């Protein structure tokens, strides 16, 4: 296998959707900061949903993007929480992996606090080959050839080999 065919974790996005702004969102931001060690950014509603009481442009969640060592460390901890089991449906055709963690109290060092409650989160892992930057760079941007994109089977093999995940 050539160096350009080595798969690596580009980023890990940790998202906590609260569905409303206010005190619950502030608590969620504090939890994400404690768990990941980074300050989260707020996510806003793309459209109005009257059934849920959500207005377009209102903050309804928070997320953190982890890269390099922080991403590696977090993904190891998160996979331990879900007992290193993933379903094939959690991999998409472009090699991304997504799974949920039901309770923040499953993380080491976190305990239940009745004033905060229990929050769940989504974890999205983006896998890429080296050289994928040509599709995102600002100077001399190029399209990525199909064989230079990670597919579902390669993503499953990468996670099984490097993180001992059962699929």
Swiss-Prot record:
InterPro entries, A to Z: Ribosomal_uL5, Ribosomal_uL5_arc, Ribosomal_uL5_C, Ribosomal_uL5_CS, Ribosomal_uL5_dom_sf, Ribosomal_uL5_N
Domain of life according to the entry: Archaea
Name this polypeptide is given: Large ribosomal subunit protein uL5
PROSITE patterns membership: RIBOSOMAL_L5 (PS00358)
Source lineage: Archaea, Methanobacteriati, Methanobacteriota, Stenosarchaea group, Methanomicrobia
SUPFAM superfamilies named among the record's database cross-references: RL5-like
Record's subunit section: Part of the 50S ribosomal subunit; contacts the 5S rRNA and probably tRNA. Forms a bridge to the 30S subunit in the 70S ribosome.
Protein purpose: This is one of the proteins that bind and probably mediate the attachment of the 5S RNA into the large ribosomal subunit, where it forms part of the central protuberance. In the 70S ribosome it contacts protein S13 of the 30S subunit (bridge B1b), connecting the 2 subunits; this bridge is implicated in subunit movement. May contact the P site tRNA; the 5S rRNA and some of its associated proteins might help stabilize positioning of ribosome-bound tRNAs.
GO cellular component, one term: ribosome
């Amino acid at each position: 296998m050539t160096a350009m065919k080595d798969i690596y974790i580009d980023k890990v996005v940790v998202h906590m959707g609260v569905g409303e702004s206010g005190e619950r969102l502030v608590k969620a931001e504090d939890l994400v900061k404690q768990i990941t060690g980074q300050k989260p950014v707020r996510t806003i509603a793309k459209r109005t949903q009257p059934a849920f009481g959500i207005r377009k442009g209102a903050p309804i969640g928070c997320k953190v993007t982890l890269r390099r060592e922080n991403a590696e460390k977090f993904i190891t901890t998160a996979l331990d929480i879900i007992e290193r089991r993933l379903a094939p449906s959690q991999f998409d055709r472009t090699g991304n992996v997504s799974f949920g963690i039901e309770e923040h109290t499953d993380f080491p060092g976190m305990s239940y606090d009745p004033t905060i409650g229990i929050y769940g989160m989504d974890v999205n892992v983006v896998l890429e080959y080296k050289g994928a930057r040509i599709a995102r760079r600002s100077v001399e941007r190029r399209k990525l050839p199909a064989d230079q994109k990670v597919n579902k089977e390669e993503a499953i093999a990468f996670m099984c080999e490097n993180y001992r995940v059962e699929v």
